[in-house]
């Protein structure tokens, strides 16, 4: 019988901590705006980001924290333009980005409430922060 997803999340967290693993989230999806305006990331960008992770290129690069989702965003990557790294810079209309990011982070926050009390407090605090 499958267990609640919070059980598997806890097991993953313990394994990552005990083995001192780095975890990377690479956006290979959509950038630059809503459907009809934005575009998928080019495969060359995905490959450059993955190569950067595998070759340790991010070990000495500065990161900035995304104010909506709390993700650490690298300031540079060989072969990738800066606007491909920073989600807001990929959008022509920065106000549209802010509105969309705020709405999406609110949806994440609301959905995650069902996990309250089932996951560690640090996990709850790491989630999106709607503005």
Go through the PLM ranges and name each one.
Residues 1-131:
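Conserved NTP phosphate-binding and transfer environment spanning the P-loop NTPase/kinase superfamily
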């Amino acid at each position: 019988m499958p267990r609640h997803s919070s059980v598997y999340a806890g097991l993953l967290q313990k394994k990552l901590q005990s083995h001192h693993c780095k975890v990377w989230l690479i956006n290979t999806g959509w950038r630059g705006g809503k459907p009809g305006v934005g575009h998928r990331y080019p495969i060359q960008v995905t490959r450059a980001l993955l190569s950067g992770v595998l070759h340790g290129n991010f070990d000495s690069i500065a990161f900035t924290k995304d104010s909506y989702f709390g993700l650490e965003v690298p300031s540079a990557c060989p072969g990738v333009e800066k606007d491909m790294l920073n989600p807001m810079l990929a959008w022509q209309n920065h106000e549209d980005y802010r509105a969309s990011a705020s709405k999406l982070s609110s949806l994440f926050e609301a959905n995650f409430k069902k996990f309250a009390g089932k996951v560690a407090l640090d996990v709850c605090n790491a989630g999106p922060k709607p503005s």
